[in-house]
């Protein structure tokens, strides 16, 4: 078979060459379609599993944020034909198992304010939800442009704790990085401790047995104490209440378990915490799927989030979830327990919210392709308005523009 080249001369191609050209043309068509559908600087109305949401696009990424909870439920690359979000979708997982799941704001990356863990019996009687009020409220949305950035700001009052929670997502045109800035305002006239966690959670199929790995900027760690080994279809595999150095945790069988890895033969439930590196101002956590050549990560200040809780739910169904939960406290436990303990590893377990005042936090999240052979993250740095991600053993790095910085 022959085709006419640009020179006007006939060129001959093997069938494999023709197949390549067809695939290449399909990719060009897809990217052109994506560019039309996901223009730079777009905010629109959308849904997540039938629930009202706002979509934010910058030509490279598309985010879906639900009005309930200001929850980031999906993040997708414009050039990804799979449209694969790395984030946990419990509604889809339940549906695929022939079950139902009611959305309460808990999915993907949701916020736990003011509370991270179970409410006390008295709080529960007063209507306080598990993980605080912020993820359970319905938010007002305002969107717009700030220079080359598209923004979506979501605001809600937390009626029980008398706080106002405001979260702003900002995405610069064409970048793989999103800035998330939050304000928490007290409406009361006294100082009080605040319990706050960013419940970032990845899920299947991005979370894949024997493939997906998690890296972070910390070492001193502890497994969560527990009493019950078996918990329905999953069982504990870590010794409870034991200190260890990330990522090798003590297993019940006496052998160390590498917590970077997603376990084969899933039927496990893991829980541990890591104190983030006290020698660094900026901390990071990443989730990497080398088979799909995709990476999700976060960069944030240690002064705002000194802890990272690891929750791994690996049922035999393969509908898995893993929390990358950076927070003010090591574990999701009732506030009374947190305040009574005060510190762990000589590090505070809460932050203060002054009377009639406001505290702020900010983090960056990124989602991007990685090169072939990139299999481990040794460091993530924010320098010169760029995020640099390194795999030193492979002698590879990924550099992403991060105009907004921290």
Positions of PLM-derived features:
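Short, linear, compositionally biased motifs with a strong N-terminal bias
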Residues: 14, 31-32, 207
